Amino acid sequence: MQSQLKACGDAPAPSCSLHHRRTISKKPSNGGNSGGGGGGVNSAYLATDVTTLDINAMFQSKKMKRHGAGVTAPSTPANYLGASAGAGQANPAHFNFPSYLNPASFYPNVDLLGGSSEHLPPLMSVPAYKPTSMLHGFSDAASAMDFAQLTEELNALQNLSASFPNSTPNAFQSLFATDSPSSFLTSSAVSSHLAKPSPLTANSVRGAGGRKNRMVEVKMINERPVVIVSDPQAASASARSQIVHLNRNVLGVLKGLEASKKRSISAEPLYSRKVFIGGLPIDVTEEEVWATFGWFGKVLVDWPRRPEHGGRGDFYEMDMGRRNSRSVSGYVFLVFQDEKAVQELVNACELYENKYYLQLSSPTMADKAVQVRAWRLSDIDYFCDENASVDHRRTVFIGGVPRPTRASDLAYCLQQHYGKVSYVGIDIDPELKYPKGAARVTFATAQSFVRAISGRFVQVTHADTNKRVEIKPYVMEDQHCDECQGKLCKHNYAPYFCGDSSCLQYYCEACWDRMHYAMCDNRADHRPMVRTGDQTRILPRPPHHSTSHYHHRSTPSHHHNHTHQNVTSSLLEHAPHLQNTSIISRIVNRNNQNNNSANSTPPQMKQFSAIPTAIGY
């Protein structure tokens, strides 16, 4: 034991450390090579890696030893902390915990207790701590274990259905029993015992834990049912076709097929080729879906693509390849190549409470009833009276409509709130004829149309769905200005539509400024709606107004007022019937106005198509 002078007082320190470190037997002198600041060659801090945590732990340990005179633990065995700890104490029952249980004791190349407090180095000159390798016996870093490669091998064992051809005790002992550390679970050692799965097994088609969209069809080869699986995005046909043997027969589907053959198949299309399958078990496999629905014909299995579970997809991708971030939602879409296959599928289902169900199994559930929701083509349109005329100027657009909603159901909901409806059309995909989640509704009267625009929302209820959707004006293309009938814009089509309930008209640039800034100050905050392709956009300001000259909720200058007064007087001379007319009367009499203006329209009109791409705010 030796006595060392510290800033906090004298405290005895053992000359033998826990890890057999070499201690400093003599303090470096200020006049020697130490340089007076602990920076000499004899300083213990130059040849070691010391951090602020080590220095603080040293002083805390010294302080506890000075005030507590050592913390003892009764009946502590000699081998509790190893042989070296027992050798350093004559009596193991009086083991000095502060001397050994401190962070500084875990550094194998420095004895901090042997240093002097007046020779502490500057913090900026202390190098960062570099931990040594935990694997003893490696001579260099290249021979150490590659944990990244080990993780890949373990994931391969989980994700892939690897089979061990030599699955004997000797084979496994040769795999894991190694003589040298460098050969511990290396890539060559594991790969030699991993056999690639057969292409005829079902798991070979599944790739790295993700469900892929596949075109499948069940056929009979040598009196055995097999599934022909193909990748629709593959470059060549030979590279995308695989054969998967069925391990068992789907009895529920076979019984349904026998029952469907007894029912007639319509020659006219009755359903969309796209079918929704809901209520799937969470652990259902791709092969079970293929084997269940592939009997009805060639079908594309389209799994949902949106991410689920808030970014936890990586966890599900490692779960034996059955679930991932985009295929755990419990439903799937089927796109059949022939519409008659959909009719056979519906005929094979069981009807319960106006819903169709089919049995499907999973590793944890046997013969679960899943819902088969086919879209009827007769539910696309609804006409209140087929002989009545439909005024498209009284049409509204409704987005976010639930896909199972029929046109008649939507018409019933709107008539309960706003008035009589003459037509409802569900927007569908032109190829598959499947709903896109939007609809167009035409009201029978102008009062109902204005009431629906003012209400803005409607509650759509169908079966188990109950959703609140928004009502917007339906903007059409190739429409003339409702104020000037094209007289002030050289008979060009009107670029803007005002969707506010006080306007609901198409405007040219001149009439927009006159009606929103010159005649009414309370219309200055109205935003124009423009039609671009199949979409309708609401712009923050008219594009013909530059950003520097556009003032929100402000009236034009005196020069602009004089210009608008001239435009107003010229407009009233050409169309005196537009003065002091209400919005309802303008909508009701619009057909007559369009017929009168069509006679004075030149045969050649320039179509409006110049909508600015970049619009400043």
UniProtKB/Swiss-Prot annotation:
GO terms for biological process: cell differentiation; negative regulation of cytoplasmic translation; spermatogenesis. Transmembrane segments: none annotated. It holds the Pfam family RRM_7. InterPro entries: CEBP_ZZ, CEBP_ZZ_sf, CPEB, Nucleotide-bd_a/b_plait_sf, RBD_domain_sf, RRM_dom. Residues 273-377, 394-465 form the RRM domain. The keyword Cell inner membrane does not apply. Residues 542-563 have a biased composition (Basic residues). Keywords: Developmental protein, Differentiation, Repeat, RNA-binding, Spermatogenesis. GO terms for cellular component: cytoplasm; neuron projection; nucleus; synapse. Residues 1-38, 534-568, 592-617 are annotated as: Disordered. GO terms for molecular function: mRNA 3'-UTR binding; mRNA regulatory element binding translation repressor activity; ribosome binding; translation factor activity, RNA binding. Signal peptide: none annotated. PANTHER family: CYTOPLASMIC POLYADENYLATION ELEMENT BINDING PROTEIN CPEB (PTHR12566), CYTOPLASMIC POLYADENYLATION ELEMENT-BINDING PROTEIN 1 (PTHR12566:SF17). Interacts with fbf-1. Cytoplasmic polyadenylation element binding protein that binds to and regulates the translation of specific mRNAs. Essential for progression through meiosis. Involved in spermatogenesis. This is Cytoplasmic polyadenylation element-binding protein 1. It comes from Caenorhabditis japonica.
